[in-house]
Curated annotation (Swiss-Prot):
Keywords: RNA-binding, Transcription, Transcription antitermination, Transcription regulation. This is Transcription antitermination protein NusB. It comes from Alkaliphilus oremlandii (strain OhILAs). Pfam families: NusB (PF01029). Involved in transcription antitermination. Required for transcription of ribosomal RNA (rRNA) genes. Binds specifically to the boxA antiterminator sequence of the ribosomal RNA (rrn) operons. One of its GO terms (cellular component) is cytosol. Belongs to the NusB family. InterPro entries: NusB-like_sf, NusB_fam, NusB_RsmB_TIM44. GO terms for biological process: DNA-templated transcription termination; transcription antitermination. One of its GO terms (molecular function) is RNA binding.
Length: 138
């Protein structure tokens, strides 16, 4: 399984957790054993899910802050899952370049979101990296 597919699976798990309002990582273990998932990708999935769950309030606050005039309950569930994934990578997984996280989030948005989702996701993530000065650290 490639990193791209692992990222897609992680987004789906975050989506499911949100829909079920159940952010217990042990309950999603079954996803990690579907098909052939390499150990490296399992580690990535575990890391992202753990960071997303442990930092859910902080990540959601950032999403609300940068999605001007949009409350979380008005953001489409799939858009929220994509943003939670991207922010988990950008903020807590410094070994992944933020540009990769943004590009991959936009690709997921094109596949799973509405016509507006790619621009919405790009706008929020772009504003965040600009405001946080991440572009200066390249």
């Amino acid at each position: 399984m490639s990193r791209k597919l692992a990222r897609e699976l992680t987004m789906k798990v975050l989506f499911e957790m949100h829909i079920n309002n159940d952010f217990n990582i042990q309950r999603v273990e079954h996803h990690l054993f579907e098909g052939s998932i390499e150990e490296q990708q399992k580690e990535y999935i575990h890391k992202v899910l753990n960071e997303a769950i442990l930092n859910l309030e902080a990540i959601d606050s950032i999403i609300e802050e940068y999605s001007t005039s949009w409350k979380l309950n008005r953001i489409a569930n799939v858009d929220l899952a994509i943003l939670r994934l991207a922010f988990s990578e950008i903020i807590y997984m410094k070994d992944i370049p933020y540009r990769v996280s943004i590009n991959e989030a936009i690709e997921l948005a094109k596949i799973y979101g509405s016509d507006e989702t790619p621009n919405f996701v790009n706008g929020i993530l772009g504003k965040y990296v600009e405001q946080e000065g991440l572009m200066l650290n390249e």
